[in-house]
């Protein structure tokens, strides 16, 4: 636990003006990132945090509201606030957008088909995407994913080996990797930044997805960012969205 003077130093160390609740938010995110509070662990009460940080309870509540809005914590009525855990349900809600067309746009997580994993040196593009140095190693995971038994997605996932040591030696990798990152490597994904565009299937895509070359695909380029701001995963997905949609909720 941070002592009061240490917390006050953190709150006063920001050279640029930030609202007080934003400074409290930054302190709380840092503690989650550093493992002071583990996934699924209850956070101290708002009153306790306010006393420790030397701010009002309302300021802490506003910071907690921001954490909840970003799905970094979960609130349970009558029980308090908990660090978000990357369960399959949580991952589905936050990071997977493919859905079957319906009024509810029920999302799906495509199931794992084939998979290959290898370790190698990062190339120039990978170093640029993940802010790696020359000579850094990465793990490349290639997957096909299925919906109702039919291949729908080809994926290439690039991970910095220094963040995920020996991940390529795992006996088997789970369908949803974010839970593994959190439980085994203490890396919690805070944000996923995506770029989408329409492309035509090349010969490899067509063969993997059972399509004709030139068939339309949805190309999703995603960078996953950890709680501490570090870029931890580059994922490229090429999706056959026939009878599927990419669903987004805009508040």
For the regions a language model picked out, list residue spans one by one:
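Residues in the helix-turn-helix
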Residues: 59
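Short, cationic-aromatic polyanion-contact patches
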Residues: 21, 45, 82-96
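C-terminal all-alpha effector/ligand-binding and dimerization domain
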Residues: 110-251
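Short, hydrophobic-biased segments on the C-terminal half of alpha helices
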Residues: 64-65
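Extreme N-terminal segment that seeds HTH/winged-HTH DNA-binding domains in transcriptional regulators
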Residues: 1-55
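A short, N-terminal "cap"/entry segment at the start of jelly-roll beta-barrel domains
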Residues: 88-108, 113, 119
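Beta-hairpin "wing" of winged helix-turn-helix
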Residues: 36, 69-78, 84
């Amino acid at each position: 636990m941070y002592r009061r003077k240490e917390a006050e130093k953190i709150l006063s160390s920001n050279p640029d003006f930030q609202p007080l609740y934003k400074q409290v938010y930054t302190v709380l995110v840092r503690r989650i990132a550093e493992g002071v509070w583990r996934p699924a662990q209850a956070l101290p009460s708002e009153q306790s945090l306010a006393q420790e940080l030397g701010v009002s309870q309302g300021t802490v509540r506003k910071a907690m509201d921001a954490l909840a809005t970003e799905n970094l914590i979960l609130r349970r009525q009558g029980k308090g606030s908990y660090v978000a855990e990357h369960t399959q349900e949580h991952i589905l809600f936050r990071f997977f957008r493919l859905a079957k067309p319906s009024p509810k746009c029920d999302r799906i997580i495509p199931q794992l088909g084939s998979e290959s994993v290898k370790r190698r040196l990062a190339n120039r593009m990978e170093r640029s995407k993940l802010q790696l140095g020359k000579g850094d190693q990465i793990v490349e995971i290639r997957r096909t994913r299925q919906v109702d038994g039919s291949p729908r997605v080809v994926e290439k996932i690039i991970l910095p080996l220094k963040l995920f040591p020996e991940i390529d030696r795992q006996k088997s990798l789970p369908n949803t990797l974010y839970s593994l990152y959190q439980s085994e490597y203490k890396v919690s994904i805070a944000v996923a930044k995506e770029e989408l565009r329409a492309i035509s299937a090349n010969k490899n895509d067509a063969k993997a997805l059972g399509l004709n070359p030139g068939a339309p695909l949805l190309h999703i380029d995603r960078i996953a960012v950890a709680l501490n701001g570090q870029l931890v995963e580059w994922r490229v997905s090429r999706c056959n969205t026939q009878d599927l949609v990419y669903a987004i909720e805009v508040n």
